[in-house]
Amino acid sequence: MLPQYDLDYKRAKPNRFVGRTSKSVTRTNKPNQRLGSISNSHVGADFELVAMKFFRRRGIKLSRNFAVEVGVSQKKRHCFDLGSVNPKVIVECKSHRWTAGANVPSAKMTVWNEAMYYFHLAPKGFRKILFVLHDRRSRDGESLLSYYKRTYSHFIPTGVEFFEWDETTRKIVKV
């Protein structure tokens, strides 16, 4: 239970990451906001906590907004969603879904491509992980991660690892 957001993931409905929300939360006229959520930023922050807990159970303690120097000709600090100096790990978390009509969320794929670019620019020696929500398209059952890897493989730097979190089983899906 995350009391600050009044979300209970043990009672989450299948394929609904937000879980139970407070009765005082009302749905505003925001067509691109996740149903039942206070805001999309809350959904992302909650998903980061899920990732932190997953890695902590495996002995990797991560910090939020982990800053690393990245760049091509010059270096500038970039904050990854999660990271650690010992062991050297950086993680980007994405809780994106297929659109309601089972179409590709193309703007979200651009954000994934941006994450790949930052992984490419990150210092050598860091383990690079994209931690994503497992979401299957209703039409053919393809997961969003499988689609991304099939379509954008040319953007994925060597060595990037993918973890696909199934919110129903609360486990990583084998890709």
Where is each model-derived feature located?
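A detector of short terminal or domain-flanking linear segments
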Residues: 1-25
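Acidic-and-aromatic substrate-binding clefts and catalytic sites of carbohydrate-active enzymes
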Residues: 69-75, 137-140
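Alpha-helical scaffolding within the catalytic cores
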Residues: 76-78, 149
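Short beta-strand or tight-loop elements
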Residues: 3, 64, 78-80
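Acidic-basic catalytic patches of nuclease active cores, encompassing PD-(D/E)XK
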Residues: 30-69
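Charged, structured surface patches that assemble and position nucleic-acid processing machinery
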Residues: 38-42, 46-49, 127, 148-175
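Active-site beta-strand-loop-beta-strand hairpin of nuclease catalytic cores
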Residues: 78-95
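Catalytic cores of nucleic-acid endonucleases
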Residues: 93-151
